[in-house]
Amino acid sequence: GPSFCKANGKPCSYHADCCNCCLSGICAPSTNWILPGCSTSSFFKI
């Protein structure tokens, strides 16, 4: 399931092998269209 970006240490990116992040810190694989983690308008790097 989703995890905290700081916890899994993955960079925030649009790449499928990276982590998608939002202001809440929740993230999920960018290929997961059901639970994408957050809107693309809220993406940022940690």
Curated annotation (Swiss-Prot):
It comes from the Eukaryota. One of its GO terms (cellular component) is extracellular region. InterPro entries: Conotoxin-I_CS, Toxin_19. It holds the Pfam family Toxin_19. The modification D-phenylalanine is found at residue 44. Keywords: D-amino acid, Disulfide bond, Hydroxylation, Ion channel impairing toxin, Neurotoxin, Secreted, Toxin, Voltage-gated sodium channel impairing toxin. Disulfide bonds join 5-19, 12-22, 18-27, 21-38. Expressed by the venom duct. Belongs to the conotoxin I1 superfamily. Iota-conotoxins bind to voltage-gated sodium channels (Nav) and act as agonists by shifting the voltage-dependence of activation to more hyperpolarized levels. Produces general excitatory symptoms. This is Iota-conotoxin-like R11.17. It comes from Conus radiatus (Rayed cone).
